[in-house]
C-alpha cells in the first residue's frame, strides 16, 4: 500500500503515476506486500529535516526514513517514509526535460531503494539515472528503471 500525504499541492496525475512507479519498484525488491508513505513538501521543510537528521543545511530532492534497520530479521509492514521536495523536484524536472509528475515518481523509487536498506555515496545534484556509476549505484539504477518502465510515455 502506498499512502500519499501532500503538504504541497501535487502535480496533475501524480497519484496514479506514483502508484504505478512505486508498485513496480516494490515488486522489483520483493516488498509489494509492504507499505510506504510518500510526503510531498517544499524546500523549507526538507531543508529543516536534512539539517536536523543529517547536519546539512541545504534542501535536497528526497529523504528516506526507514522504520527498520537492514539486517534485522523482521521487516515491518510499514517500510518507512519518503519525503520529496516538490520545489527541488520541479527544478530537476525542468532541467531534465520531463514533467514534475515523472520526476516525483522516479524520486520515490530512489527513496524506496533506501527504505529497503541500500545506500550510496553522497552525490548532491547528481541524478541517479544520469551518470552516477559504480556497483553501489546499480541497485538504484535498477529500481529507477523498474519505476520508469511502469510510467506512461510523455508527449
Swiss-Prot record:
* Gene Ontology annotations of biological process type: rRNA processing
Q: Where does the protein principally reside?
A: cytoplasm
Question: What's the EC number here?
Answer: 3.1.-.-
Question: How and how many cofactors are bound, per the record note?
Answer: Binds 1 zinc ion.
Q: What are the recorded GO MF terms, alphabetically? A: metalloendopeptidase activity; RNA endonuclease activity; zinc ion binding
Cofactor dependency: Zn(2+)
* Keyword set, alphabetical order: Cytoplasm, Endonuclease, Hydrolase, Metal-binding, Nuclease, Ribosome biogenesis, rRNA processing, Zinc
One term under GO cellular component: cytoplasm
> What SUPFAM superfamilies is this protein classified in?
Metalloproteases ('zincins'), catalytic domain
Q: What Pfam families has UniProt attached to this entry? A: YbeY (PF02130)
Out of the domains of life, which is the source? Bacteria
Q: Where in the cell does this protein reside?
A: Cytoplasm
Listed binding positions for Zn(2+) are 110, 114, 120
Which PANTHER family does the protein's record reference? ENDORIBONUCLEASE YBEY, CHLOROPLASTIC
Q: Which family does it belong to?
A: Belongs to the endoribonuclease YbeY family.
User: Briefly, what is this protein's role?
Assistant: Single strand-specific metallo-endoribonuclease involved in late-stage 70S ribosome quality control and in maturation of the 3' terminus of the 16S rRNA.
Protein name per the record:
Endoribonuclease YbeY
Amino acid at each position: 500500500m502506498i499512502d500519499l500525504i501532500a503538504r504541497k499541492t501535487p502535480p496533475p496525475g501524480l497519484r496514479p503515476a506514483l502508484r504505478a512507479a512505486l508498485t513496480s519498484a516494490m515488486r522489483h525488491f520483493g516488498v509489494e506486500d509492504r507499505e510506504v508513505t510518500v510526503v510531498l513538501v517544499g524546500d523549507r521543510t526538507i531543508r529543516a529535516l536534512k539539517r536536523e537528521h543529517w547536519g546539512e543545511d541545504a534542501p535536497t530532492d528526497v529523504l528516506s526514513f526507514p522504520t527498520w534497520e537492514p539486517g534485522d530479521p523482521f521487516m515491518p509492514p510499514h517500510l518507512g517514509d519518503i519525503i520529496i521536495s516538490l520545489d527541488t523536484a520541479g527544478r530537476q524536472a525542468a532541467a531534465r526535460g520531463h514533467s514534475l509528475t515523472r520526476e516525483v515518481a522516479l524520486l520515490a523509487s530512489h527513496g524506496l531503494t533506501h527504505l529497503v536498506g541500500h545506500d550510496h555515496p553522497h552525490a548532491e545534484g547528481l541524478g541517479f539515472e544520469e551518470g552516477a556509476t559504480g556497483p553501489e549505484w546499480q541497485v538504484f539504477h535498477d529500481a529507477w528503471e523498474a519505476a520508469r518502465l511502469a510510467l506512461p510515455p510523455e508527449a
